[in-house]
From Swiss-Prot:
Family per record: Belongs to the universal ribosomal protein uS14 family.
One of the protein's GO biological processes: translation
Principal place of residence: plastid
Keyword terms: Chloroplast, Plastid, Ribonucleoprotein, Ribosomal protein, RNA-binding, rRNA-binding
Protein name, per record: Small ribosomal subunit protein uS14c
GO cellular component, one term: chloroplast
Organism name: Ostreococcus tauri
SUPFAM superfamilies reported for this sequence: Glucocorticoid receptor-like (DNA-binding domain)
Job of this protein: Binds 16S rRNA, required for the assembly of 30S particles.
Subcellular location, record wording: Plastid, Chloroplast
Organism placement in taxonomy: Eukaryota, Viridiplantae, Chlorophyta, Mamiellophyceae, Mamiellales
Amino acid sequence: MAKKALIARETKRQKLVQKYAAKRLEFKERIRTAESIREVVSIQREFQGLPRNSSKVRLKNRCAKTGRPKGYYRDFGLSRHVLREMAHQGLLPGVRKASW
């Protein structure tokens, strides 16, 4: 299981991304419609004032149960280990063992 601090850091990043999403879109739109280079540079300076962790690219997908960053299944929000265990226990509706 991942350290509690790593899980907490990731949830904090998710909150920051949601908080600043509208502001980031506004800045990007202003940059796109800017008429002069100076205007673009001044808008970019304002844009750089936003928190670094408010960018979506800094997010890392983690398992909701264990916090594991690798082997993550987007559809379920779980790592492969937890997904397998929950599927065997019948806790995931519509998921069953493959047979061909």
